[in-house]
């Protein structure tokens, strides 16, 4: 069930720190909507360079992937009233101006603002859910799906966060040990950290064994690998 504006404010001002919802800075009370909170875009972005990259392979080493990601994305900081231009078909990363921390009994869903969506601007591709326990600034996955360039200015309200009650407080919060959380405490626009997925080491070992001829590849290889994966992380 979504939190109303009254419930959102009540949790922001809660006396008990573990139950407190943190959103800072709150520049205007206009950011409070009937059952959501408007988020502003910050000043740092990462835009795609015009480079040739064959593919991103999660099985290569982390150092190789880091070099590829840095080569692929160019960080820029936008000054006030200058803005960044998102051309038709372009993709960029941005982040919220606000720092957010969710308590154990509140999750959140990130959505774009209809005003910008009607111009073709998408604020997130897949990362729309925020787990209880998350702390940091949310990253936007920005894409211009229209046919006219759009200028984004730091401080504009481009997204909204809808908060939802958990029937029971989460036992393992985002950022907890073993939770495989890759973006806890991020304070700037953060590129993909897919290479830090804990399960990838399992697949890397199997790949090395296969290349060395120590691993037989049966017809039901995927079933066998998934069975081993389940047993390893059980």
Q: Predicted regions: what is each one?
A:
Residues 1-234:
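DUTPase catalytic domain/fold
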């Amino acid at each position: 069930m979504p939190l109303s504006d009254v419930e959102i404010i009540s949790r922001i001002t809660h006396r008990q720190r573990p139950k407190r919802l943190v959103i800072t800075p709150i520049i205007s009370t206009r950011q409070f909507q009937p059952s959501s909170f408007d988020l502003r875009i910050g000043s740092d972005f990462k835009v795609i360079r015009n480079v040739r990259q064959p593919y991103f392979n999660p099985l290569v080493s982390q150092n190789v992937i880091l070099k590829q990601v840095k080569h692929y994305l160019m960080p820029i900081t936008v000054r006030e009233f200058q803005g960044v231009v998102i051309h038709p078909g372009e993709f960029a990363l941005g982040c919220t101006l606000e720092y957010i921390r969710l308590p154990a009994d509140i999750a959140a869903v990130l959505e774009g603002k209809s005003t910008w969506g009607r111009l073709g601007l998408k604020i997130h591709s897949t990362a729309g859910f925020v787990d209880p326990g998350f702390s940091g600034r949310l990253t936007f996955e920005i894409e211009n799906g229209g046919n006219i360039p759009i200028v984004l200015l730091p401080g504009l309200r481009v997204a909204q966060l809808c908060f939802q009650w958990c029937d029971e407080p989460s036992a393992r919060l985002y950022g907890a040990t073993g939770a495989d959380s890759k973006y806890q405490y991020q304070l700037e626009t953060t590129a993909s950290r897919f290479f830090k997925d804990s399960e990838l080491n399992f697949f890397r070992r199997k790949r090395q064994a296969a290349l060395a001829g120590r691993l037989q590849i049966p017809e039901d290889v995927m079933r066998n690998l998934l069975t081993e994966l389940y047993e390893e992380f059980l």
